[in-house]
Swiss-Prot record:
<feature type="domain" description="EF-hand 2">
    <location>
        <begin position="116"/>
        <end position="146"/>
    </location>
</feature>
<dbReference type="InterPro" id="IPR002048">
    <property type="entry name" value="EF_hand_dom"/>
</dbReference>
<dbReference type="GO" id="GO:0005794">
    <property type="term" value="C:Golgi apparatus"/>
</dbReference>
<keyword id="KW-0256">Endoplasmic reticulum</keyword>
<feature type="binding site">
    <location>
        <position position="135"/>
    </location>
    <ligand>
        <name>Ca(2+) 2</name>
    </ligand>
</feature>
<feature type="binding site">
    <location>
        <position position="83"/>
    </location>
    <ligand>
        <name>Ca(2+) 1</name>
    </ligand>
</feature>
<keyword id="KW-0479">Metal-binding</keyword>
<keyword id="KW-0931">ER-Golgi transport</keyword>
<dbReference type="Pfam" id="PF13499">
    <property type="entry name" value="EF-hand_7"/>
</dbReference>
<dbReference type="GO" id="GO:0016192">
    <property type="term" value="P:vesicle-mediated transport"/>
</dbReference>
<comment type="subunit">
    <text>Interacts in a calcium-dependent manner with LMAN1.</text>
</comment>
<feature type="signal peptide">
    <location>
        <begin position="1"/>
        <end position="26"/>
    </location>
</feature>
<keyword id="KW-0813">Transport</keyword>
<feature type="binding site">
    <location>
        <position position="92"/>
    </location>
    <ligand>
        <name>Ca(2+) 1</name>
    </ligand>
</feature>
<keyword id="KW-0677">Repeat</keyword>
<dbReference type="GO" id="GO:0033116">
    <property type="term" value="C:endoplasmic reticulum-Golgi intermediate compartment membrane"/>
</dbReference>
<feature type="binding site">
    <location>
        <position position="85"/>
    </location>
    <ligand>
        <name>Ca(2+) 1</name>
    </ligand>
</feature>
Amino acid sequence: MTMRSLLRTPFLCGLLWAFCAPGARAEEPAASFSQPGSMGLDKNTVHDQEHIMEHLEGVINKPEAEMSPQELQLHYFKMHDYDGNNLLDGLELSTAITHVHKEEGSEQAPLMSEDELINIIDGVLRDDDKNNDGYIDYAEFAKSLQ
């Protein structure tokens, strides 16, 4: 597995956090997170519902138990859309990727190089930006999670 896909995986896993919601886990078998060819997705790299709710504290007043996986998915998207244009641009993707990378690594984790980060963002845009506008909109984001 290349360094690009190893670093891209945590970002995509962070995007898959909705599937770690307790209700979703009952419907989706845990084995689906580590099947061969699934880019190494596993429970250790996926952001959980509790982590998302920490970031949404004070923003969302609905209890997490009442939120559907789709609502959590939308809120995750919105919490990385810093300029509020309903699109994720390269900078917003970069911030999300480095956030995931920092939280998964130890304090001594090596910093991601600028070239590695650029390659990951380029890969995300190449694979998931279906209309080639340079942004990931919510429909593209949701489709990438299927």
